From Swiss-Prot:
Its main location: nucleus. This is Microtubule protein alp7. Residues 1-79, 93-114, 164-223 are annotated as: Disordered. Residues 25-36 have a biased composition (Basic and acidic residues). It comes from the Eukaryota. Residues 219-273, 367-471 form a coiled coil. GO terms for molecular function: microtubule binding. Required for bipolar spindle formation and proper chromosome segregation. Has an indirect role in connecting the kinetochores and the plus end of pole to chromosome microtubules by targeting alp14 to the spindle pole body. Involved in the emergence of large microtubule organizing centers (MTOC) in interphase cells. Attaches to the minus ends of microtubules and associates with the sites of microtubule attachment on the nuclear envelope. This leads to the stabilization of the microtubule bundles. The modification Phosphoserine is found at residue 17. GO terms for biological process: astral microtubule organization; attachment of mitotic spindle microtubules to kinetochore; cytoplasmic microtubule organization; meiotic centromere clustering; microtubule nucleation by interphase microtubule organizing center; mitotic chromosome movement towards spindle pole; mitotic spindle assembly; mitotic spindle elongation (spindle phase three). Residues 1-20 have a biased composition (Low complexity). It comes from Schizosaccharomyces pombe (strain 972 / ATCC 24843) (Fission yeast). It is found in: Nucleus; Cytoplasm; Cytoplasm, Cytoskeleton, Spindle; Chromosome, Centromere, Kinetochore.
Length: 474
């Protein structure tokens, strides 16, 4: 965006010839806008006029004053308004730039990104992007209606408004005062002279006057940082508001849960009073519920609940209600089981009686004669006796093996005891031998010292004798 503002500054510092051309173009533009404002109703069809009246005017530039508003994000506002203006221009198809068709493509990305080819071969000026070069395109009625529907829309600058684009006060953007811009009262014909057309076509100046150039306002890093901090503050405020909302919702939930608990307690008291006889578990549950209600009453008298107290009370109440429901459902379950038993007893009573009668009449039935039955019985008896003998033999062998194992264990215990005694005795003998060995080593050391002393004495004696011999000879 800073490139666009700087380009507009470069445009204002051009040669005198370009400034004179801009003055002539300003005269032509002012006359054209006056002429178009007067005849826009006759040029625009009724259907198009109604749609244009209902369509809000595109906004191009924000209101920039000498003292900037710190809460206004200028960059985002300029990007949004430029995109809106480009989309509005795209609705009116493409314009003819110097006889060559040149379609206008809407820019969906912000202007702060990489520069498109549109910025490479044209002056980087906001109006050079949004308006065509050739003002002679608006000589026809259709072009006049298009210019009347777009360029005469209210913006931040003092344009003459046509009667076909009357909008409500709420949808109009703020308009600067007309004192800083000269009012054009030129009554030239609609088509400018030929030399003006050539100058405008050959020059790189746009078809708008200097009044159309936005007010220059550089955006420095301090303002960007301030806008960033303000955005963060707004985010924190939103989070704080959300936290307050959650707190209020939780407080309402606590109140609702407390009311539900009190209602459940009242229902339990009504059930207790309406029931003639209750079980001991139900009585204990009701007593606990009454105690819990008393605790709640004391807590209410003491002050508000804390979150831990609320969780504790809810847990206790849920446990009490669960125990009470378990007792009630257990009683109902037992009653159902007894009813099922009685029902099945009645259902199968005839079958049971019939089976009992059959069992009673079975001994009176005639015996079935079988010629091989006696032989099979004798064979089975013989097999039984054989198996009995084998079993007794196996039992005896097992007993013998058990006795052998017991004797072996006893012998092993005795052997272990003797081995331990021998080991302890050998340990004592080894200790004695070790002591004797130490004594012998000590004696040996003493003898070695004595022998060393004797050897030393003998050597001294030999030396003394040699000296005596030498003295005698001398």
């Amino acid at each position: 965006m800073s490139d666009i503002v700087s380009s507009s500054t470069d445009y204002s510092r051009r040669s005198p010839s370009s400034s004179s051309i801009g003055t002539n173009e300003t005269d032509h533009t002012g006359f054209h806008e006056k002429r178009q404002g007067a005849s826009s109703e006759s040029l625009i069809p009724p259907a198009q006029r109604s749609s244009e009246e209902s369509m809000p005017a595109p906004k191009l530039f924000p209101k920039l004053t000498s003292k900037p508003n710190p809460q206004l994000n200028l960059k985002d506002t300029l990007n949004k308004r430029v995109s809106d203006r480009l989309q509005a221009l795209e609705l009116n198809k493409s314009f003819d730039f110097s006889g060559t068709p040149r379609p206008m493509h809407p820019i969906s990305h912000p202007l702060s990104q990489h520069k498109t080819p549109e910025f490479k071969h044209r002056k980087r000026n906001v109006e050079s992007i949004l308006t065509p070069k050739n003002p002679s395109l608006f000589s026809s009625s259709n072009a006049a209606s298009q210019r009347g529907s777009l360029n005469t829309a209210p913006s931040n600058f003092a344009y003459s408004h046509s009667s076909s684009l009357q909008t409500s006060a709420s949808s109009r953007p703020p308009v600067l005062s007309n004192g800083s811009f000269p009012r054009q009262t030129n009554t030239a014909p609609l088509n400018p002279p030929v030399h003006l057309k050539d100058n405008i076509r050959n020059s790189a100046t746009p078809s708008t006057s200097q009044a159309d150039i936005p007010t220059q306002y550089p955006i420095n890093s301090t303002q960007k940082q301030q806008a960033k901090y303000e955005a963060e503050i707004e985010g924190y405020k939103a989070k704080l508001a959300g936290t307050y909302h959650e707190i209020s919702v939780l407080q309402n939930t606590i109140v609702n849960v407390s009311g539900q608990l009190i209602a459940v307690n009242d229902q339990l008291q009504q059930l207790r009073s309406g029931k003639a006889s209750t079980s001991p578990s139900t009585k204990d549950t009701n007593m606990r519920l009454v105690e819990g209600h008393n605790e709640e009453t004391l807590a209410l008298q003491r002050g508000k609940y804390t979150q831990e107290e609320v969780d504790k009370l809810i847990q206790e109440r849920m446990e009490k209600v669960a125990e009470d429901l378990h007792a009630q459902y257990s009683a109902k379950h037992t009653q159902k089981i007894n009813a099922f038993k009685a029902n099945y007893a009645r259902k199968y009573e005839a079958t049971i009686q019939e089976l009992q009668n059959q069992i009673g009449t079975a001994p009176n039935a005639p015996k079935i004669s079988n010629s091989n039955w006696e032989e099979e019985r004798r064979a089975l008896k013989a097999d039984n006796q054989t198996l009995q003998k084998q079993l007794e033999k196996a039992i005896q062998e097992r007993q013998d093996m058990s006795d052998f194992l017991n004797n072996f264990k006893a012998d092993m215990a005795k052997s272990d005891k003797l081995l331990m005694q021998q080991q302890s005795q050998q340990t004592g003998d080894l200790e004695t031998l070790r002591l004797q060995l130490q004594a012998l080593q000590e004696e040996l050391r003493v003898e070695r010292e004595e022998r060393q002393q004797l050897i030393q004495m003998s050597e001294d004696l030999v030396i003394a004798m040699d000296q005596l011999n030498l003295e005698q000879k001398s």
